[in-house]
């Protein structure tokens, strides 16, 4: 690093390289960008939604989310619940990417949609705000990518899966 002859991407699990070499590299004309997953206040911000260019990218993002949030147990693979969860996230992220204004294309919007996805045991006809959003989108564009994914999720999952995923 001290030779400063190239561009670098450095992993720094202990957080020492940035402290020890950061100022030197900045003085040498380098632009330092840090993604700190331990202390987000010391991190630049990363929005994966900014890198979505196609439906294939949505699927890659969903797969990355699933892989990085699954448990270590025997059932952490491609079982029914994981498949339903993938359809659900694909539908929500597809909706955000195609329909949301640029300032709402982020994980905050995704989490708000997940939190609004309430299911009620005693009322199978209940529609939460996300169901209503998808109904409106389907009325406007029945072949929309997000609508197709949400339809598959609802068909595969039903109320039972909704309750399990949202609890």
Predicted regions mapped to residue ranges:
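Switch/coupling segment of Walker-type NTPase motor domains
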Residues: 2-95
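Non-catalytic, charge-rich alpha-helical accessory subdomains
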Residues: 81, 85-86, 90-167
